[in-house]
Amino acid sequence: MHYTGTIWRPPYEAYSLLVQVTAGCTHHSCKFCTLYEDLPFKFKLSPFSEVKADLAEASKYYRKIPRIFFTGANPFVLSTEKLKTLAKMVKEYYPFYKTIGCFARITDIMPKSLEELKELRALGYDGITIGVETGDDESLTFMNKGFQSKDVLEQCRKLDEAGISYNFFYLTGIYGAGRGEVGAKKTAMLFNQLNPKIIESSMLTIYKTSELYQEIQKGNWKEESEIEKLIELKTLVENLTINTRIVTDGASNLIQVRGNLPADKKKLIKHLEYQISNADEASLLELEVLCDIFDFSKPLLHRLG
């Protein structure tokens, strides 16, 4: 199998076959992100011969996998024709596959027409994961995400119309000190107009190699406290009114939260309120450092510097 650098996938894709079709990120400019700094290039498309060889190799061992996940930061940036070709390759080796997932940026959806998206859905593209992070335009601009909340609304409604389901990544702590609750409410207002199947929340972790760390050093941005991050997460849950699943499965999270909304809302809020009322900032900081220290490829958090 051809894999380049660290391979990232959502926790809920644990049972999908991971096939590399791209490596790196076309944007690669978010101030907080260090995920692809181990690569000597910004973005690369895998040769189709390699993709085909990987599918052939995997099919010798796993013949009945229903879902394929294309790796890379945003394979959905590829043209519709390339995505169709990749789906046909999957069909050749996995004739009974059901769906294909991948990461996508909002900007990857923009150039694709509704008819193109419907074609992709017919070939199995479904359950794509989008790193929205927040619905707060101020934070989207500061973190250099490359899109605004109105773009999220327009493009995800296009996915809805095409029948392609999607999941959102939400980044707790992205707003900075004193803005957590305001940002969470703005995000809930955006998400409530859409239909994410899963909202996967991760807590912002700041590495010394990130551009965001340099902003902190210059005094341009201040991190939320750990307790404020928990309050922010509670605020998001309180203000969501859609049918969705919210989870905090990633290693960066201080606590694990899993539930279906609106059915589990009261239970989740009660759990978060308990954690907040019993939280000690120093202990939470220590916990975050201990969680992070297992990633030996990264410098320690700036708090240890």
Where are these regions (language model features)?
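Canonical Radical SAM [4Fe-4S] cluster-binding loop centered on the CxxxCxxC motif
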Residues: 4-50
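Hydrophobic faces of well-ordered beta-strands that scaffold small-molecule active sites
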Residues: 17-19, 68, 98-104, 128-130, ...
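Conserved, mostly hydrophobic/aromatic
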Residues: 25, 33, 51, 70, ...
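A short acidic, helix-capping loop that chelates divalent metal ions and anchors anionic groups
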Residues: 41, 136-142, 211, 255-257
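Conserved SAM/AdoMet-binding glycine-rich loop
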Residues: 59-165
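Conserved strand-turn element in the central/C-terminal portion of the radical SAM core barrel
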Residues: 107, 135-139, 159-183, 202-208, ...
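Catalytic cores of alpha/beta
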Residues: 115-117, 176-193
